[in-house]
Amino acid sequence: MPKESGRKVVATNRKARHNYHVMDTYEAGIALMGTEVKSLREGHASMVDGFCTFYNDELWMEGIHIPEYHQGSWTNHAARRRRKLLLHRDELDKISQKIRESGFTVVPLQLYFLDGRAKVEIAIARGKKDYDKRQTLREQQDKRESLRELRERNRR
């Protein structure tokens, strides 16, 4: 069976861009078990509570829910286990330096397959305040209304 080419998105963290100001993004590989890969290929994953932390100078992703593979037996994985992210040392150093600054965190944005390999897009982000979230929603609503008015004007 030939490897797939291109990018197949499995899961996205839609709340991440709502709750955080995204500064930098990185692409990282993930150390997964076989049943996790099979479950991901079926499109099963949830990134709602996902976050990344450093342990022993390595970046780990937590809170991601990959359900057990339905045809797996006793070899199945734990659904909410910690998963190691695979990055170059210089990227890890840059990320850890940014995290040491106050207010920055690392959040996963997207989980996908790229040329047959599972990847995750992570971002260095700063948390939004409540008034920032309301302002963003207001801007999006104004943009939608202006597009709607423009569409109605063009119909006439």
From Swiss-Prot:
The lineage of its organism: Bacteria, Bacillati, Actinomycetota, Actinomycetes, Micrococcales. Belongs to the SmpB family. Gene3D superfamilies: 2.40.280.10. The keyword Cytoplasm applies. Residues 134-156 are annotated as: Disordered. GO terms for cellular component: cytosol. The keyword RNA-binding applies. Keywords: Cytoplasm, RNA-binding. It is found in: Cytoplasm. This is SsrA-binding protein. InterPro entries: SmpB (IPR023620), SsrA-bd_prot (IPR000037), SsrA-bd_prot_CS (IPR020081). GO terms for biological process: trans-translation.
